[in-house]
Amino acid sequence: MDKTILKKKLVLGSVNFTQKYGVNPKQIKLSEIKKIFSLAKKKNVMIIDTAESYITKSNIFKNLNKKFQLITKIIPSSKWTSLSYCEERIKNHIKKYNNLKIKTLLFHDTKILFTKNGPKIFNNLEILKKKKFFSQIGISIYNIKELDYIIPKYDIKVVQCPYNLLDKRVINSGWYSK
């Protein structure tokens, strides 16, 4: 195993908080979610991975310690070419998460980056980053080959991709070491 991977920070995934997902598809009860947040804080796991598509209940993040930060995913459409629309969507997104700080904003689906609207949308997000709505822009991918197009064209700081005992595509492709 590549020991550099072990140096990365742990992030708390939240998709099962509102949806049935993964190898053990169960939705977690609110009482259990509170226990998970408490344990995460105790163990200094202060980053939560989430997405606008995960939130169906607004009370999950209510009263959560403001020291938690988010890595959150969005699915922009062509409407995001409007800076004011982008800003409004991000503000609404932040409100849904009880005004927690967004550390990293990820494209949940990168298809828009391959279109003529991609550069304009990315530029709008760069403007919002400068306004301190979030600290970094990244992508969430399943197809490692997308990196060949996206990385040279956009200033991506974070790539979220599958990695586990059975799926080491990011390592085998050479992208992890770049």
What label would you give each PLM region?
Residues K95-N117:
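Active-site groove signature of glycoside hydrolases
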Residues V15-F17, A51-S53, K73-S77, F107-T110, ...:
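Active-site beta-loop-alpha junctions enriched in small/polar residues
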Residues F17-S31, I74-Y85, K111-F114:
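Active-site mouth loops of central-metabolism enzymes
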Residues P25-A40, T81-N98, I141-I150:
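Short, acidic/polar
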Residues D49-N59, S77-S84, I112-K116, L166-I171:
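Acidic-and-aromatic substrate-binding clefts and catalytic sites of carbohydrate-active enzymes
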